[in-house]
Amino acid sequence: MNNPQTGQSTGLLGNRWFYLVLAVLLMCMISGVQYSWTLYANPVKDNLGVSLAAVQTAFTLSQVIQAGSQPGGGYFVDKFGPRIPLMFGGAMVLAGWTFMGMVDSVPALYALYTLAGAGVGIVYGIAMNTANRWFPDKRGLASGFTAAGYGLGVLPFLPLISSVLKVEGVGAAFMYTGLIMGILIILIAFVIRFPGQQGAKKQIVVTDKDFNSGEMLRTPQFWVLWTAFFSVNFGGLLLVANSVPYGRSLGLAAGVLTIGVSIQNLFNGGCRPFWGFVSDKIGRYKTMSVVFGINAVVLALFPTIAALGDVAFIAMLAIAFFTWGGSYALFPSTNSDIFGTAYSARNYGFFWAAKATASIFGGGLGAAIATNFGWNTAFLITAITSFIAFALATFVIPRMGRPVKKMVKLSPEEKAVH
């Protein structure tokens, strides 16, 4: 049923909170492709008889493909709406993750993890843009709740994965979770839409504040923000991929490590609405400065304090993820603040490339550095990169102002974005 004055659906399908819930559910369904990997890494390594670095390279490749799929998928999302791209993304997650447990070679592992990663990139972009477009007045909070789904969504899966890994093995764990994730994503695709969209098609309304991807890539603001996002991701992705292997190197029990993975995901996801809300109140860049500064200090101290015992290890994981996770509420909303919403799906894909590039360190390279030079060296590198992000957010980005498109003059209030 349509509202004759607005042309919008009424009832549940016209309620923007319904679409925020769908966005969060989508994030929950793709969360495990990244955040449960640390549980799979050692069983996969043992099954294939290869090094940890070789297995973690699969994680890196998946992250890279996630970034590559977002601008391309975003083009079709911006042009036609989210439904058909979401169906394709869900099918890729289903096929890639379900069959990963059947691989008998490293190339097959890489191929299937990248297929799942490509699907994740498409789904992530759709979920985040659904939240941003339905909530232009509460963009930080909406982005935070949606990003929280990506961090927290893995939690219900962790006991299932741990149990199935012990009883039935890695193949069954991949298959059960892959089927659940893929099928639910495809079902959500039948009802999701953007505001102003009727049916499957979407019309783009472009204003002078909307930058297409080519225009955005020519602004210095994009590249400084990209560098900050790239820098702060080193430490978080190192821990995402390697918190369990690192904990084992400290001699921690398997039960402690399982609790640690749950805690890191709880704080990683739970912090995102909080930091999004804070950024709506005090500004994106001030919030970035606080988050990135604390993260740099935590990573510098991580190997010293985590070695003190079980509680210290879990506490450091919690603080590290509570700060790093905030970036996933801050950058999507900043992207829409500065470059507009008309092309936001494809534009955020270019921001996501920063995370993918940082994952090279978080996955195979980080594991190789830890193996050859020790974990202290790996954590020191991540502390330095988070400090770079802090410096950019504190001293550089706020002074740059808002980019101006096509010689359009903006008021001082418009130019001073947060």
From Swiss-Prot:
It is a multi-pass membrane protein. Signal peptide: none annotated. GO terms for biological process: monoatomic ion transport. Changing Q66C: Residual activity. It is found in: Cell inner membrane. The protein has a two-fold symmetry axis, with a central cavity which may be associated with substrate transport. Residues contributed from seven transmembrane helices probably line the substrate transport pathway. Its velocity of transport is the highest one known so far among transporters of organic molecules. Monomer. This is Oxalate:formate antiporter. It comes from Oxalobacter formigenes. The gene is oxlT.
